[in-house]
């Protein structure tokens, strides 16, 4: 079987020319100019890995650096190593054999529970991995009652998602919505939320922006707090940096001033 070549951009050129060409057939009005919405408030909460996580993370980080530097290794295999580092930050690791190793006393889950005790109102909790979504939902159901939490992710049917949204929006007993931003981050109205917590992020800026705006749209009367759980000096900081670079590039392409974000 033949391999597939993937070209990776290292820098961008002629952005001014691209901007001028876009202006000839496009007109853009931002949400800020059309709607009078309360502000978004961004916060970070540092999460420190436990000893087992640290040891495995450092071992796999050294391995990942060697693999990424090796030009003979496929791009897909390099991505697997990055994915594993991200999994460790989020409390689990999928091995080569497909087995799931779950770290005891997940520090991120503990920090999430602390945040939920501090904040008022309803909360959306976005997580990238199915394991985290199911674990968070189970934990919150045990602590606050099964009717306090609903989920939206790939395993849920369209009808179940509609029921979850309706319960979150209108049922006072339902305080938490846990979901994957790629599944629940588009088109839904979740303005009952006053807090949006990112248990984890991906490199996809569109998914991030769209998932933020499920709570911050017409009908929202309160300030919305966005809280990111981040492991310092880890792959998660690289993901945040990549998202910020994409925001700046987008603004530059559209001829706008990049707003402070995150």
Regions found by a protein language model. Give the residues of each.
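A conserved SF2-helicase RecA2
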Residues: 203-262
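SF2 helicase motor core recognition
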Residues: 133-137, 162, 175-200, 204-223
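Inter-lobe coupling linker of SF2 helicases/translocases
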Residues: 1-101, 105-121, 243-248
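Conserved nucleotide-binding/hydrolysis micro-motifs of P-loop NTPases
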Residues: 51-54, 130-132, 157, 183-185, ...
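Short glycine-/polar-rich loops that comprise or flank the Walker A/P-loop
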Residues: 40-42, 145-148, 191-195, 220-226
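Conserved helicase ATPase core of P-loop NTP-dependent helicases/translocases
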Residues: 124-126, 134-137, 141-184
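Short beta-strand segments
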Residues: 46-47, 86, 123-130, 149-154, ...
